[in-house]
A protein has these predicted regions:
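His/Asp/Glu-enriched, well-ordered alpha-helical/loop segment
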Residues: 264-298
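Conserved beta-strand positions in the central sheet of alpha/beta enzyme cores
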Residues: 87, 158, 220, 252, ...
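Glycine-enriched alpha-helix->loop->beta-strand junction motifs that scaffold or abut catalytic
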Residues: 153-154, 213-218, 243-250, 270-276
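Short catalytic-loop micro-motif centered on adjacent basic/acidic residues
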Residues: 85-89, 193-197, 251-255
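Metal-associated gating/positioning segment near the N- to mid-region
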Residues: 47-107
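Divalent metal-coordination and catalytic microenvironments
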Residues: 10, 25, 30, 49, ...
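Histidine/acidic-residue-rich, glycine-tolerant segments that coordinate divalent metal ions
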Residues: 90-93, 105-240
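Histidine-rich, glycine-flanked metal-binding segment
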Residues: 1-53
Length: 298
């Protein structure tokens, strides 16, 4: 057999055994096949000292390019980072998701899935006041209609709990979000509820948030250092977070430029607490503090 490519000397990951080892890979028409070490006629790629990975999935970015002040073009960001699929984390809501789908998702070579924002206008970042998360503005019927229209594209809901978005509403926005997520699941659609938890107001403490989340829901910006954090007075990950993980709550790093801290990461890493690595790439931090997903993996 003549192979299209042979990748030699690369480090591959055996996810079944959780092991790393050096291996040659043989490719024909874009697929890995059994190899013959004596074969020739292929283009040889020397991957000595490098990891050879499948396409990565990044769980948090903002791709409404030209539609809000966070948006970046996925095809500029993702290929150089080895990302083939990515989640847009609530850039748009029911007011503007159609535009994002037509002008962003359909045109992208990178496969983009989305969490639709519970607030109709989507994320409003970079201002003193963000999107106002008034639970009265969360329309379950409208949101469900979008899940029915775009079941292949919309995979969950996004809510941003922060001083600038939910202060004064307490946990009511999250309570409403949980009700909507449960209704969508009851209708037969997979639905992750992803909750941004950074710079939390006093009326929405971490303990209250965790009590409301269901197994499979996601707590985002785990290592942030604005206001209440995940640590107790001894710098240990708090018991309520460890208990929440045991009952199936997912914890996402969400290493945004202002929503993470190296000291927090270092202390939490001792317990290998996070389950999802993500880098919330957006136009305002593409060339700044954030680093690619592969750096987070290392």
């Amino acid at each position: 057999m003549v192979y299209d490519y042979i990748i030699r000397n690369g480090i591959v990951i055996d996810f079944q055994r959780n092991q790393f080892y050096k291996k040659d890979l043989y490719l024909v028409k874009g697929r890995i096949v059994e190899g013959d070490p004596s074969a020739d006629g292929a283009e040889i790629i020397d991957a000595e000292g490098k990891y050879v990975l499948p396409g990565l999935i990044d769980m948090h970015a903002h791709y409404f390019y030209g539609g809000n002040n966070l948006g970046i073009n996925a095809d500029i960001l993702c290929p150089s980072q080895g990302i083939t699929t990515s989640i847009d984390a609530g850039s748009t809501g029911t007011m503007n998701f159609d535009a994002f789908y037509r002008n962003g998702m359909l045109d992208s070579m990178t496969e983009i899935k989305a969490y639709i924002n519970l607030i109709p206008e989507g994320v409003k970042a970079g201002y003193k006041r963000g999107e106002c998360c008034d639970p009265d503005d969360m329309d379950c019927d409208q949101i469900l209609a979008f899940f029915k229209k775009y079941p292949h594209a919309i995979k969950g809901l996004k809510l941003r709990i922060a001083e600038e978005t939910t202060k004064g509403f307490g946990l009511e926005p999250l309570e409403k979000a949980v009700q909507i997520a449960e209704k969508i699941r009851w209708e037969g659609y997979p639905c992750v509820l992803a909750v941004h938890c950074a710079n939390l107001p006093e009326d929405a403490p971490i303990s209250g948030i965790l009590q409301l989340l269901k197994p499979g829901d996601s707590y985002t910006h785990l290592y942030q250092n604005l206001g209440e954090t995940i640590f107790d007075s001894d710098r240990k990950v708090r018991k309520e977070l460890r208990d929440a993980r045991k009952r199936g709550i997912l914890f996402e790093t969400g290493n945004g430029s202002i929503h993470w801290s190296i000291p927090n990461l270092t202390d939490a890493y001792k317990t290998a607490f996070s389950r999802i690595l993500s880098v919330p790439m957006q136009c305002c931090n593409l060339f700044g503090k954030n680093h690619p997903s592969v750096c987070s993996m290392q």
